[in-house]
């Protein structure tokens, strides 16, 4: 159970129980605590908070409307409980900080409309109008150190995608298509960051040890990596080849969305398990990560033997 500014919330779902209809008419609003089950999220709050402003909740708990309760006395409200704590805070304090993302403001607006919280409704509408003025706005941090990268990923509540590109790491010449493929990787990263910036943390790394490499993170740890470079012997000398594995990048980006928090409760572990996500295969994690590292190492060291090497082998 987690304390939330005077209210308590339990986010775990509760099994269905027998329900009955009751009325709160005549209850003392100054002292009575009530238990609310809002879409499976459980809240404790006071009658005073619920009846402080003229909203649907005041109508429910002042006797003007009947309410449903289960056998344990929880008041049942058939709405998503994600933003109900914000609704309660607004009713009690008259003000509340709004979420940053447009999607969450829209979700909160829908709840404010349902509960008839006029002041919060107007604030959400004003915030959305301001976002219409200034958006689209996409922030992509460029990391300055590995510690900064670790801190960004560890403190983010979103899955993360990092593109490392650093042409100066190359010891050899590039193959003919490498520059074009490098640009294609950068352009795809920019397009993905514009499309998913509200749901995924996108990070650029221009100081790492690789030349072109994608990394995908969920729940604060690396889930997958797509290395786009290899050393080849296509000519008489070594060359660095940069590839553009577009389909694989799209696949890993979509997979990383499975680690997105659902209704403030973290990723859906059942879905991760069904789709082979890391949460569903934690007991094989070390072995799988080791195999992935070996696979990446093999991909990075593809060698095509030179004609003179093949000649020596036949002698």
Curated annotation (Swiss-Prot):
Compartments reported by the entry: Nucleus
Phosphoserine: modified positions: 23
PROSITE patterns: BTB
Region ranges (Disordered): 269-294
One GO molecular-function entry: identical protein binding
Induction line: By tumor necrosis factor/TNF in cells.
Residues with the N-acetylmethionine modification: 1
GO biological process, one term: negative regulation of Rho protein signal transduction
CC per GO annotation: Cul3-RING ubiquitin ligase complex; MKS complex; nucleus
Protein's UniProt name: BTB/POZ domain-containing adapter for CUL3-mediated RhoA degradation protein 3
Source organism phylogeny: Eukaryota, Metazoa, Chordata, Craniata, Vertebrata
Gene name for this UniProt entry: Kctd10
């Amino acid at each position: 159970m987690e304390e939330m500014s005077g209210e308590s919330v339990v986010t775990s779902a509760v099994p269905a129980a027998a329900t009955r209809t009751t009325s709160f008419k005549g209850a003392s609003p100054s002292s009575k605590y009530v238990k609310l089950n809002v879409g499976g999220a459980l809240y404790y709050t006071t009658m005073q908070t619920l009846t402080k402003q003229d909203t649907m909740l005041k109508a429910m708990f002042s006797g003007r409307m009947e309410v449903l309760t289960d056998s344990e006395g929880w008041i049942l409200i058939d709405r998503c409980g994600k933003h109900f704590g914000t609704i309660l805070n607004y009713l009690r304090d008259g003000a509340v900080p709004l979420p940053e993302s447009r999607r969450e403001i829209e979700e909160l607006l829908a709840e404010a409309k349902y509960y008839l919280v006029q002041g919060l409704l107007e604030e959400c509408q004003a915030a959305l109008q301001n976002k219409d003025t200034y958006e689209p706005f996409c922030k992509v941090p460029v990391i300055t150190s590995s510690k900064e990268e670790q801190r960004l990923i560890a403190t983010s509540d979103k899955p993360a995608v990092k593109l490392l590109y650093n042409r100066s790491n190359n010891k050899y010449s590039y193959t003919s298509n490498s520059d074009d493929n490098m640009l294609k990787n950068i352009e795809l990263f920019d397009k993905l960051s514009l499309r998913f910036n509200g749901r995924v943390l996108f990070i650029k790394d221009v100081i790492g040890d690789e030349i072109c490499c994608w990394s995908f993170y969920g729940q604060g740890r690396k889930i997958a990596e797509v290395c786009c470079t290899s050393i080849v012997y296509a000519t008489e000398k070594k060359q660095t080849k940069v590839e553009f594995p577009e389909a694989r990048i799209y696949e890993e980006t979509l997979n990383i969305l499975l680690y997105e928090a659902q209704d403030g409760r973290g990723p859906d572990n059942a879905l991760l398990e069904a789709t082979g996500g890391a949460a569903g295969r934690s007991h094989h994690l070390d072995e799988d990560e080791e195999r992935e590292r070996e696979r990446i190492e093999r991909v990075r060291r593809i060698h095509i033997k030179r004609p003179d090497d093949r000649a020596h082998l036949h002698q």
